């Protein structure tokens, strides 16, 4: 549960300088704390979160995951931030097609700390309730704004998709949504089967 995850991350000794894992220009931009992944509690939390994410129907439809790279647990205390950056193309040998942030703190527990994603020149500021996940292409420029009060806890990670192209993934996600809508509306099975077959064939066509 979310409460159990937060309890497991409450130990002060669990946290270290987050800049140790950043590379290139991101290293200079990163000012946060990161859970020691050698710690059994942190490792257990990461395994639980990864399994839950990969089992989620919405994530499976949107990401079509082939693999998930290691997760990181981070904490931003007052004055900490992560400047604008693009995630590395590979993490632990896994191609990063999609990045995600799972919020572990409620928005009223900290000030500032918004995840800001630059999508085609338009910026979206994201502060979601604890337990909420945002999934976005790893090619997007993004940052975490300075925390002005309290502490912001989150899990971040990366997914390799079976579909490399973000545009193709978006089309397949729309088809999955249409199939769900047709099922809810009681559409004939033959109609739904034709659309499902089309989606499966597109996955074959688009897939690596």
Please state what every model-predicted region is.
Residues 57-173:
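Catalytic core of non-heme Fe(II) oxygenases with the double-stranded beta-helix
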């Amino acid at each position: 549960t979310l409460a159990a995850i937060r309890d497991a991350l409450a130990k002060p000794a669990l946290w270290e300088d987050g800049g140790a894992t950043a590379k290139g220009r991101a290293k200079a931009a990163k000012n946060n704390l990161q859970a020691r992944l050698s710690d059994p509690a942190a490792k257990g939390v990461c395994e639980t979160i990864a399994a839950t994410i990969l089992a989620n129907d919405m994530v499976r439809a949107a990401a079509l995951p082939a693999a998930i790279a290691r997760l990181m647990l981070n904490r931003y205390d007052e004055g900490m931030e992560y400047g604008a950056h693009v995630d590395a193309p590979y993490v632990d040998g896994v191609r990063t097609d999609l990045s995600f942030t799972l919020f572990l703190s409620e928005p009223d527990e900290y000030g500032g700390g918004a995840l800001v994603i630059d999508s085609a020149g338009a910026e979206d500021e994201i502060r979601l309730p604890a337990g909420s996940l945002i999934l976005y292409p790893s090619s997007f420029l993004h940052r975490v704004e300075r925390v002005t009060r309290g502490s912001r806890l989150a899990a971040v990670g990366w997914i390799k998709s079976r579909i490399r192209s973000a545009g193709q993934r978006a089309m397949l996600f729309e088809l999955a949504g249409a199939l769900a809508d047709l099922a809810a509306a009681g559409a004939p099975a033959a109609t739904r089967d034709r659309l499902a077959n089309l989606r499966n064939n597109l996955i074959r066509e688009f897939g690596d």
